[in-house]
């Protein structure tokens, strides 16, 4: 595997990932996470995990310009739901930036903690990673980080350590979808 730079989406998935790969440099880059208060909660949770396990975490830029670049990448697909082309474009955006950082810092490969999430499509992520690998000449390290009980152990540890566990993917579109879903459930309960 050599040296690897692993994109970090959130602390719960980081906890799951480190059961498989701990000797790595981690990269928290997420201009997709909104609002700012949510980004700050997630960054603080990653800090807590990094400090607890002595992990090497770098932080990518979170600015209006980076958010604008991310929005440009996904805006044509904003009305599509979770797991759609919108997510594919978002993941591609995040992994491309990770590959650029990996190449700049001399890493042999790059990966993502998204591979730990039970809500993500692993073949889609692998395809995106391989495409970016060809573009930047940095290998994409693919591994199902959920395996071997790691996901369940990550959940247990996050509760034990008091790590923030988010309830939506991160982007404003997934937040709105979640709110709409909960409003619909509430309406149905109100009519029973």
UniProtKB/Swiss-Prot annotation:
Its EC number is 1.17.99.6. The keyword Iron applies. The keyword Plastid does not apply. One of its GO terms (biological process) is tRNA modification. Pathway: tRNA modification; tRNA-queuosine biosynthesis. Disulfide bonds join 169-171. It catalyses: epoxyqueuosine(34) in tRNA + AH2 = queuosine(34) in tRNA + A + H2O. One of its GO terms (molecular function) is epoxyqueuosine reductase activity. It holds the Pfam family QueH. HAMAP family: QueH (MF_02089). It comes from the Bacteria. Transmembrane segments: none annotated. This is Epoxyqueuosine reductase QueH. Keywords: 4Fe-4S, Disulfide bond, Iron, Iron-sulfur, Metal-binding, Oxidoreductase, Queuosine biosynthesis, Redox-active center, tRNA processing. The gene is queH. Catalyzes the conversion of epoxyqueuosine (oQ) to queuosine (Q), which is a hypermodified base found in the wobble positions of tRNA(Asp), tRNA(Asn), tRNA(His) and tRNA(Tyr). Belongs to the QueH family. [4Fe-4S] cluster binds at residues 9-10, 87, 90.
